[in-house]
A protein has these predicted regions:
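Cytochrome P450 heme-thiolate "Cys pocket" and heme-binding signature region
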Residues: 131, 302, 421-455, 483-487
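Cytochrome P450
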Residues: 1-13, 73-81, 136-147, 157-181, ...
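Conserved cytochrome P450 catalytic core segment spanning the I/J/K helices
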Residues: 134-136, 236-310, 344-346, 418
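N-terminal membrane-proximal hinge/A-helix region immediately C-terminal to the signal-anchor transmembrane segment
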Residues: 2-110, 120, 124, 146-155, ...
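Cytochrome P450 heme-binding "Cys pocket" and the immediately downstream C-terminal segment
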Residues: 322-324, 393, 445-491
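Conserved cytochrome P450 K-helix E-x-x-R motif and the immediately C-terminal K′/meander segment
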Residues: 44-68, 342-383, 496, 505
Length: 508
């Protein structure tokens, strides 16, 4: 009996190898950081906690850097070719737009939002979303960013000189408030109430999505839809839907009275919202209620979560690198002096060092460190590697942003000056992948950068950021080399929730 079982398993494995021989040949040609296990592939790397899963992916990225810009991994039966060279990665992201089946699992959480949707759904919507998030439209939101940044610093005032706290909790509330205002045109007020239902629902959805990706059995739709996770998802979805429906009714009623021919932002600033613009397009371009809801949900989740993690990462890095923080503060002082005036859209281009700090923090720790694509046909990469149809690509922004071939020998160091001193390669070669790249790259880069510069700038004008614990002076002023520990997710989270301390500047 035992012999029969062993022979059956061996036969199944041989059959599997035969059916996947093209992928397995590519796996052997490229190589991998970890040994292959029959029936599991590298699945054992992902049957653990979120921190170890992410670290294993980072190790595969490190192997790709040292292996000519590529490595491989198997998630059970799914084969992935990881890319860490910008030429190959840029080619895939520009010409191969379909995401893999694993990312399509996220559709249970984002519905048909174009962020994770199939190309057939994404393509007709991309121009609309890009137009809504244009610089012209997003610039109108700066008063919202400035107003909520002032609320942020006031909410932090009681924490001056106290023990460490999670800066992410407050920046997450800030981003939920600004996305509520800019997307829905409603005041959420989660900064003054950290238990606000919309904020909890958004964060809950993202946590559930991460759990589904980590637990392989949830990759089976039948099991997922009968799980407690799915029941909880429906409860969170109902909370978000109530907010969206309320805002949709407000804006569709207004749009029905005044249909415009072009995408315009109203002159009255308090009316500005992306949903208002969506509603104007509802009848003009055949956008139905479901599309409005799904796109609003996707924008809300993407804008609030990624921006909060990005701003929190930059804040934590500033706390650990006081010399960098002082340079950023001096730049702010040159722009604002001793005044307490709000930040304006005209101020943002002058904050070049602050922008470099944010870019450098996100270079080292991109909020979405991996992007997937799927080859729908046989292709040849610019490097000359032949890739068979059906191959899943794992584009590692983490490895791409740390590849010393392009970033230099100090690629793992936190040095914002690299974006200002002309040391980077010619801009014709894209080497910065923190916001992805190509047609399906992040359409909200302007929104994210403006909101982060505003919140961090306002924060530094009032407070000095300090590490959660008193740093070891033997490390010098640069602080520890790896102060942050991240957990796997659709958008990564810091294991300790970005703890910092603050002290007032000049009695402010």
């Amino acid at each position: 009996m035992l012999l029969f079982i062993l022979l059956l398993l061996l036969s199944c494995h041989v059959l599997w190898l035969w059916r996947n021989r093209r992928f397995f040949n590519l796996y052997r040609k490229v190589g991998s950081r970890f040994p292959f296990v029959p029936f599991m592939g590298h699945g054992y790397l992902y049957l653990t906690n979120g921190e170890k899963v992410l670290n294993n992916l980072f190790k595969i990225g490190d192997h790709a850097i040292s292996n000519g810009g590529m490595s491989t991994t198997w998630l059970l039966h799914r084969f992935y070719l990881m890319l860490a060279d910008p030429v190959d990665a840029g080619y895939v992201l520009k010409h191969h737009l379909e995401k893999d089946e694993l990312m399509l699992l996220i559709r249970y959480f984002t519905r048909t939002s174009s962020v994770f949707a199939k190309v057939a759904i994404w393509r007709p919507r991309r121009k609309i979303v890009s137009a809504l998030l244009s610089h012209k439209n997003v610039s109108k939101f700066e008063p919202v960013f400035a107003k909520n940044s002032e609320v942020l610093v006031e909410q932090l005032r009681p924490l001056i000189g106290k023990e460490a706290f999670s800066i992410w909790e407050h920046l997450n509330a800030y981003t939920v408030d600004i996305t509520g205002s800019t997307i829905f045109g409603i005041d959420v007020n989660s900064q003054t109430n950290l238990m606000e239902p919309l904020r909890l629902a958004i964060n809950g959805i993202m946590e559930l999505a991460a759990e589904v990706l980590l637990q392989i059995w949830y990759h089976v739709e039948f099991l997922l839809k009968r799980s407690s996770i799915y029941k909880q998802l429906l409860e969170y979805d109902h909370v978000v839907k109530c907010y969206v429906d309320k805002a949709l009714k407000k804006h569709t009623d207004a749009a029905s009275r005044r249909i415009k021919n072009d995408i315009e932002v109203p002159d009255d600033d308090h009316q500005i919202s992306l949903l208002h613009l969506f509603a104007q397009l509802k009848e003009q371009r055949g956008i139905d209620h479901t599309t409005l809801y799904d796109e609003s949900l996707g924008l809300l989740m993407a804008a609030s979560d990624t921006t909060a993690v990005g701003a929190s990462t930059a804040a934590a890095m500033l706390a650990h690198w006081p010399d960098v923080q002082e340079k950023a503060y001096q730049e702010l002082y040159e722009v604002f002096g001793d005044t307490d005036r709000h930040m304006t859209i005209e101020d943002l281009p002058r904050l070049k060092y602050m922008e470099a700090v944010i870019k450098e923090a996100l270079r080292l720790y991109p909020p979405a460190p991996h992007v997937t694509r799927k080859a729908l046909e046989d292709i040849v990469l610019p490097s000359g590697l032949s890739v068979p149809k059906g191959t899943n690509f794992l584009i590692s922004a983490y490895a791409l942003n740390r590849n010393p071939k392009y970033w230099g020998p100090d690629a793992d160091e936190f040095r914002p000056e690299r974006f200002l001193d002309g040391s980077l390669p010619d801009q014709s070669l894209t080497i910065y992948f923190s916001f992805s790249y190509g047609p399906r790259g992040c359409p909200g880069i302007q929104f994210a950068m403006m909101s982060m510069k505003t919140s961090l700038g306002t924060l530094l004008r009032r407070y000095r950021l300090l590490p959660a614990t008193v740093p070891n002076t033997s490390r010098g002023s640069a602080g520890p080399t790896a102060p942050l520990r991240f957990l796997f997710g659709v958008v990564v989270k810091e294991a300790d929730n970005f703890p910092v301390r603050i002290e007032a500047r000049h009695g402010k």
